[in-house]
Amino acid sequence: MRRKWIFLLIAVLAMALVACGAPAAEEAPAAAPAAAEAPAAAEAPAAAEAPAAAAEGATHEAPMLHEMVLAGTLPPLEERIPAEPLVIEPYNEIGQYGGTWHRFDTSKDGGHLSMAMYSYSPVHWVQDGLDKKPGLAKGWDFNDDKTEYNLYLREGTRWSDGEPFTSADFMFWWEDMVLNPDHSDVPPDYLISGGEVATITAPDDYTINFKFAASSPLFLDRLAMWPNGVTPAGERLFVPKHYMEQFHPKYNSAVTTYEEFDKSVDWRSNPEIPVMLPWMPVSYEPGTRLVMERNPYYYAVDTAGNQLPYIDRVDVTFVENVEAAKLRVLAGDQEMCFRPCVYQPLSELSVFRDAEATIGLKTDLFDSGGGTGVMVYPNWTHQDPQKRELYRNQDFRKALSYAIDRDKVQKIVYFGTGEKTTGTMSPKGIEFSDEVGKDLYAQWRDLAIEFDLDKANAMLDAAGAVDANGDGIRDLPSGDELTLRIDCDGITNRTNAAVTEIIQEGWESVGLKVQINAVDSAQMGVMQDNSEFDIRGCWGVGDGPNFLVFPNWVVWVDNNRTAPLYGAWYKVIGTDKEGTELDKAPLERNPPREEPPAGDPAWKLWELYDAARIEPDDAKRLALTQEIARVHIEQGPFFIGTVANTPTIITYLDSVGNVPTRDQLGQGGFTGPWIMSYFGAIYPEQMYYKQ
């Protein structure tokens, strides 16, 4: 009966996916992004034309703001927006003002909400990473070797309280927080080049100058990463100096610590702080609710010159899980659901489709852009020396991959969508766009993709993981008991759980003992940082639009991915910790770190990455990053995927205008990696309620 039900569900979902325009099972790597290296003009992210001239008598602002102007409590629009505002072209039509966007969100720290607000980023990814356009900055220029950049701000831009926004707000972050040894903010890696921190100055109120010791060709790409404005979802970059001075010991002698400062600087929990967002926070109930209202000084307009956003308010209620969020969508309570709906399993698609007739709910499927789907990665710097040796055996890792039934994953969990894969970076990455890249992508994708238990068994035998005591369970080469423990963040979703169970089933079928270990989120972070996990699971690789903007998956540059101790070793290179604590054991160092032995792939990956990140020539840099892929092909897999670039669900009521379809997006969507700032990258401020 269960088998019959599964195939019935597959049939229903297949029809729903077709109705939503699901991507083909095999999608070719994206075309090469347009070059974005020329100095940028002060142009809009989507619009090529300036706003239309205001018609006589038109207000071009929300009625609630116009009433305040008439009452004399708010300056007129021309005094509230910059002379050269950001112009956002609506996807379909000029919208209408009014309404409240009700959100029911599982991210109680405001992470998902931050992803809907892209307005702190000076540079914006557009067209799913195919191009970059100005955002908070109106433009930029740079010298030939990309060692010096100027970032130009929009004159007349204001914080949400009406105070001027200038280069001093960046310099406050940089000088009084980042370069302040008493504060926890540190220089982000993209402001370090040639082993030296950039020299940053502000020659005037609207110019910021960056000078690097070596070429820094990724600088603009990195400014476009994340929504910014809060950590850890990017960098703060701009902090309202006029407001935050009161909490800073340098400016207020009554303050001696940064405790109150750090509490007050985050807009997600402090509704008093001025912001540069489309909506400004007005009330906050910790872990329960956050209410925001339109920012009267927001610096963006539509192509008719109407100040954005169209929607008056954002009312966020925090809920426990995606199931609770789903119920609010089906009740018609949530007008638009991006995150967390993208985390809904595809089995829910038919449920959402059924709500079309009852509440006028629309659904679409945006590509995740993921290179692995749900995946696992063995700990390359495992604390157990026996497991460390086994996990570094390529035969063993390939055997784990051959023992995964990807056909089953694709059919049952992803309903025939996506692309089976051994695990790569995003198929939408620029590295896979030319003929060399397409060939590399295919080799990497197909490295150990077949479901072949005979091959898996033979490779496990070759790796020495044999049944030493005749109990039917494979042991370590020493004869000691072997248990593979897949460590998962306890706050996971049904898709992660379902795929991980199929992985467990496959591994057990070749004689491996497997446990799935759900761990508290905070503890999972500690285990990752200290290299205490066994095999990390319930996660996915999807970063883009190129390897170098977030290299952690393919190059071990931090402690938060495959080789924590080696990543931490690399991370302190060039800092005052380099070369210190060598008399201590790796786990006793702060942070815990270890130098790789000669011949370890870490050295080759670091060599290629260090060369690529300072290579100003685009073609040469592309060739270097493709060599990084070649290391993964020749010595991997280091992470093991299942089904890549699967579709994700978004929903919205038919009363909502200007929500793009996947066909209107540059690459059909790119919802997986947070560095792409979905859904801020499709500008919710131009979405509206039809009246």
Predicted feature locations:
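A structural "hinge/loop" feature
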Residues: 92-116, 136, 219-229, 377, ...
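Edge beta-strand plus adjacent loop/short-helix module at the start
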Residues: 118-122, 162, 252-270
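Surface-exposed binding/hinge segments that line
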Residues: 189-258, 653
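Short, charged/polar, Gly/Pro-enriched secondary-structure boundary elements
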Residues: 215-221, 300, 534-535, 649
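Extracytoplasmic/periplasmic ligand-capture domains
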Residues: 4-5, 16, 20-55, 67, ...
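Hydrophobic helical h-region of N-terminal Sec-dependent signal peptides
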Residues: 9-14
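N-terminal lobe/hinge region of extracytoplasmic solute-binding protein
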Residues: 61, 67-71, 75-144, 175
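Short, well-ordered beta-to-alpha junction loops that form the rim of enzyme active sites
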Residues: 213, 417, 643-647
